[in-house]
Amino acid sequence: MKKLNWQEPLALFDVAQTRQLESLGLARVNSGPSLMAQAGLAVAKLALAIKPFAPCYWVFCGPGHNGGDGLEAAKHLHQWGREVRVVLWQPELKRPTDAAKALAGVNALGIAVQATLPEKLDSQDLCIDAMLGIGLRSTLPTSTPSPSETLMQTWIDGLYQLGADVLAVDVPSGLNANTGQFQNKSNGLHIQAKHTLQLLTAKPGCFTAHGRDACGTQWLETLGCEDLQKSVTPAAQLNAPARKVSKPLHASHKGSFGDVAIVGGESVALRGMGMSGAVDLAASAALHAGAGRVMACYLPSDSNSALHTPVLAEVMQRNFAALNLKAGAIVCGCGGGEAVRQVLPKVLQESVHLVLDADALNAISKDPWLRDLLRLRATKKLFTVITPHPLEAARLLNTSSTEVQNDRLFAAQTLAEDLKCTVVLKGSGTVIAKTSQTSIINPTGNARLATGGTGDVLAGLLGARMAQGLSDFEAACAAVFEHGQVADDWCFWRLPTLTAGKLAELIRGPQTASW
């Protein structure tokens, strides 16, 4: 068993893949403990580790294999001299063979079993959620739930209201293990776990959408089947720190670290809404990320009002007509407004390394010709990363942001396939997708990034990493991880509000790496 700490890549398997691995694991279990027995032991050990002096361990058990894991855990806790109570959902139901055997063992040991929720708990008690796990079936808001589903929702709500700390077994009940969405989308009822012990595999839904909030501190027990994971292609992989950069040579010069040009920042004269700050933030991020030269190109370039002075003296200003699109990396769209539409055809056709953000994506979503130009870039060996938030992704997919959020992994993969580029779908558990690559879910970042301008910072950082020689996919993975890590470190030190400007200043470049 290990506590997940995001410092190394981790394969993520969806429910179908986990079932496949479970079958492989069961096939090789002979006279030793069953997978359920191993799972129950792991749950009991973790329960004791996180709450060693709990007055009582309440084990809430559903009718399936997840409930069986909980029953096995109850047996161990009882045998170790702890006060244990089992709350059994619909005891009259027929249970899987292993779970029925575990229930018989619970009864034989004289462990207290009840079929109704307790009215109240000691605040120091520990609840073990073994109700659903990955056995969750999706319930759409418009469908009529069955009596069993209604009862389970009542249990989930009841356990939530009891207020004691919860250890979830595999996946918090009410959370979809594949998508990180809630089973009941109309009311969002789910278990809010303090800890989650994932069993056999790590699941993508625990790291994106609502997963990170619902799971709390995450642990993994592979039940001795880690070697079997190599036989199944994962649904995704957890992002990890980028590969270490080489020590810069003493003879390096500013050209050694790449050029980045930021195109955007629509003038206030056009629509009464100046957005030059978006370019300044992206430029600051690129500069602090170690780019050798950073240029700002404010739009429209033929307007006197576009002669905005960059906030940082180190950032050079360029007229769009004078910009060499084939050199370095181009970041296009940050605060671009309507003006970005005029420069996009040239940017899409000529730039070699390109990051498209914000208004550039909105323009492409409205114009089939621009969309085709974007698709053609891959055939010309031109490299593109797009960085939509859910609403921008929805516009590109001609759907709603709700549908995008319902399955973030699928949405990002669909966009990558359609537009022939690397996609960074921003949000909790940012998804990075590219055709022919295993999709990546990012574990870093927090709500401090939910403020204006942080997306511009990410775009500038991404441009710098591309300019420094990383491939489009590598640059996306590295930038997203670093971007989130800065916000996580800020929370650790409990500093004041994190602004986008401060976020950009805290990014580090390869020249500052320790060696």
Regions found by a protein language model. Give the residues of each.
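Internal gly/pro-rich beta-alpha loop/helix module
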Residues: 125-126, 131-233
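Small-residue (G/A/S/T)-rich helix-start motifs and N-terminal tracts that mark the onset
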Residues: 1-90, 95-96, 100, 193-195, ...
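N-terminal small/polar loop signature for handling phosphorylated ligands or for N-terminal nucleophile
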Residues: 72-160, 305-323
